[in-house]
Amino acid sequence: MWVEGIIEGRVTLGVGSFPENSATYKSAIINGNLVYNNKDGSDTIGIIAQKDIVIPKFSPDVLEINGVLLAQYGATQSYYYHPAGSSVKNQITTYGSVISNQIWTWSWVNGNNTISGYRNTYTTYDSNLIYAPPPYFPKKNEFEVLSWDEE
């Protein structure tokens, strides 16, 4: 599933293959800006992918993504593209939330150098999601501590 555009309203998109089989899990690809028409809570999008949520190699140099991204069994990322430095972009801004089973990264770095993905990354949580998540998006009415570590 390829996704981009301006979101007016409230929607959840899911991509998968059933019955579930890890060899056939499906990914969502955000190939351009995905932005809310309004950031007042009236517009929202949830994207649920069985596998990965991916930014492709030929994405915009400055990219903005609004929404809740959930990679159920995979990663949320810009893939590492070879050769190093061949696909470095300027900036990605996310507004919403990212939920990922595996890695979450928009940048691949070697020392102080970005070698693939986005050089500058900015993330802001959309506090409207607390009381108004996308329709039918998985949620829980209570919180629990999954782990605790004190040093």
Mark where each language-model region is.
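Extracellular beta-strand scaffolds
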Residues: 1, 7-8, 18-30, 34-36, ...
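Low-complexity, acidic interaction segments enriched in glycine
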Residues: 1-2, 45
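A general structural motif
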Residues: 4, 8-10, 42, 66
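Conserved hydrophobic/aromatic pocket- or pore-lining residues that grip, position, or stack substrates
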Residues: 13
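Predominantly polar beta-repeat domains that present long G/T/S/D/N-rich surfaces used to bind, process
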Residues: 39-151
